[in-house]
Design a protein with these regions (language model features):
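Hydrophobic/small residue at the entry helix of a nucleotide-binding pocket
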Residues: 3
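Intrinsic disorder/low-complexity segments
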Residues: 132-135
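Ala/Thr-enriched low-complexity intrinsically disordered regions
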Residues: 124-130
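NAD(P)-binding Rossmann-fold cofactor-contacting core
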Residues: 10, 14-36
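Aromatic-residue detector
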Residues: 13-14, 18, 51, 126, ...
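Phosphate-bearing ligand-interacting subdomains
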Residues: 38-123
Length: 137
């Protein structure tokens, strides 16, 4: 999907030592493409690919119902960590690390901080208080 492709295209991963090795999708329009050197395979090839390639971290950017199923498949294949962008907190084997990323929560936090900054700015404009103390020489 779009988020998966955006992450695969992100240049800073490579600069920090992370390499996207392969992508998996169910969309026939995307399967067979190469994105930043990583081929897009059909999701059905997941287990076969992981059997032949040493992959430690998987990134999930799919709908909730598919994410749970794919996470179980990844665990059975020996994945050590999952970076999860699906709209669900994954419950996986104890020895598999999961980082659940909730984009909507992140956006809500950003929005809250922006509103708080606007209120502070408005208060400053109304009171003339810049927050800088006056010197009394």
């Amino acid at each position: 999907g779009n988020l998966g492709q955006a992450l695969a295209n992100y240049q800073n991963f490579t600069k920090r030592g992370f390499q996207v090795k392969a992508l998996f999708d169910i969309d026939p329009e995307v399967i067979g493409r190469t994105i930043q050197g990583a081929q897009v395979f059909p999701l059905e090839y997941l287990e076969a690919y992981l059997e032949k390639n040493a992959i430690d971290i998987a990134t999930l950017t799919l709908p909730r119902d598919r994410a749970i199923e794919v996470a179980k498949r990844l665990c059975r294949c020996g994945i050590k960590a999952i970076w999860n962008f699906a709209h669900t907190d994954l419950q996986v084997d104890e020895d598999v690390l999961v980082e659940n990323v909730h984009l909507s929560e992140s956006l809500m936090q950003l929005s809250y901080r922006m509103i708080a900054a606007r209120r502070k700015q408005k208060k400053t404009e109304e009171t003339g208080d810049t927050g800088i103390g006056e010197r009394s020489d």
